[in-house]
């Protein structure tokens, strides 16, 4: 049972919208003990000399030891790798040059342009197997003066989807490119097993009341990590923020930009900060919107943010009078929702052969809160449907969307 409405949500929804394929990284961020602030710090350690213009997509672990340390969230060894997921062969050539000599081959996809490009599974071993990155571009209205790369966060949110909905009127002379980061979406993606495996993870009680529930949470997340390893093999070892930043530098190179112009939202701000640390001499115009907390207090600050957002919704609903069936004051709406979540903690709601748990319901509510006032009426309908009519389908569907769960 959560003492605060969204203490559970911060555990079950630590990011913007991670798809199923990114769930292993989401699980690592949400359910492991917090890392120390020094692990995730995006400040280059003191050195005699920093190379501000290293080779394309390069990374020197010695120069960025904090980012590559054994306690880094990106470097949690779970189980020995099992190479049971095939990859493509590297392009012809030798070393990194086999990739630097390539061009992006765009093709029309509706009103946009799309492309698949190979990148090394392991940038430290460019002669090894390759994986695929899926890109989408919205061309400039006229001759492109620059290229803007965008990332919606997650981690694991689809850059292709972001391009599809991106309001580019402010950038008429820019090509706007989004990509599904390695391990996600239409790129070579992490597979953690069938839908029932995802259900097992997301149905765990993320706000345990006692030691038995805590042990069940730990057991469930470990089982999920093992499933991801079994289905995805060595890909899991190469889906870190650093790997993605190196991919981004390679994309910058392929479009012919000397500097990176970039817009990152939520986790995308951490990716942007990581890029700026690795390649400070290549940063052009960079906007980091809704920056993540790089200390180990991110879960707490996110819970506070969700709780504040729900308070705004509760006040809006109460102000509607008879049109709000949840209460006549913010306190009443909040209490009714907390009581509903408490009931789900003890007795999950049956929904079409599945169960709407406390954690899933809180995650579903969070999806609507991301959209602010424009989603308030939909959130009201979802809550009334579940609390008054016994129909938890809308909240479960919203949770599935935020969790990236596919259809059965």
Regions picked out by a protein language model, each given a short descriptive name:
Residues 28-106:
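N-terminal low-complexity, Pro/Thr/Ser-rich intrinsically disordered segments
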């Amino acid at each position: 049972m959560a003492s605060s409405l969204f203490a559970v949500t911060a555990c079950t929804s630590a990011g913007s919208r991670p798809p199923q394929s990114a769930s292993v990284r989401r699980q690592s961020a949400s359910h492991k003990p917090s890392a120390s602030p020094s692990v995730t710090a995006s400040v280059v350690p003191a050195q005699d000399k920093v190379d501000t213009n290293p080779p394309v997509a390069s990374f020197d672990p010695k120069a960025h030891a904090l980012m590559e340390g054994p306690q880094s969230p990106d470097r949690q060894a779970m189980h020995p790798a099992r190479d049971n997921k095939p990859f493509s062969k590297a392009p012809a050539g030798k070393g990194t040059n086999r990739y630097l000599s390539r061009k992006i081959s765009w093709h029309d996809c509706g009103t946009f342009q799309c492309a698949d490009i190979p990148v090394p599974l392991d940038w430290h071993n460019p002669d090894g197997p390759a994986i695929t990155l899926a890109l989408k571009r919205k061309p400039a209205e006229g001759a492109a003066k620059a290229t803007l790369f965008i990332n919606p966060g997650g981690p694991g949110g689809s850059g292709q989807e972001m391009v599809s909905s991106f309001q580019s009127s402010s950038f008429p002379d820019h090509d706007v490119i989004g990509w599904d980061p390695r391990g996600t979406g239409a790129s070579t993606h992490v597979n953690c097993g069938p839908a029932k495996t995802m259900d097992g993870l997301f149905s765990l009680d993320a706000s345990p009341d006692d030691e038995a529930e805590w042990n069940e949470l730990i057991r469930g997340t470990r089982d999920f990590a093992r499933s991801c390893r079994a289905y995805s093999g060595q890909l899991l070892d190469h889906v870190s923020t650093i790997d993605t930043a190196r991919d981004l530098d390679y994309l910058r190179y392929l479009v012919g930009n000397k500097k990176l112009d970039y817009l990152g939202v939520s986790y995308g701000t951490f990716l942007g900060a990581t890029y700026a640390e690795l390649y400070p001499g290549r940063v052009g115009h960079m906007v980091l919107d809704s920056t993540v907390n790089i200390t180990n207090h991110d879960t707490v600050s996110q819970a506070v943010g969700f709780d504040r957002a729900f308070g705004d919704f509760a006040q809006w609903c109460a102000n509607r009078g008879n049109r709000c069936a949840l209460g006549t004051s913010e306190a009443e709406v909040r209490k009714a929702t907390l009581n509903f979540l408490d009931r789900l903690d003890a007795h999950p709601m049956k929904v079409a052969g599945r169960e709407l748990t406390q954690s899933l319901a809180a995650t579903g509510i969070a999806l609507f809160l991301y959209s602010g006032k424009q989603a308030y009426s939909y959130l009201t309908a979802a809550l009334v449907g579940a609390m008054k009519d016994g129909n938890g389908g809308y909240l479960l569907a919203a949770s599935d969307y935020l969790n990236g769960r596919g259809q059965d």
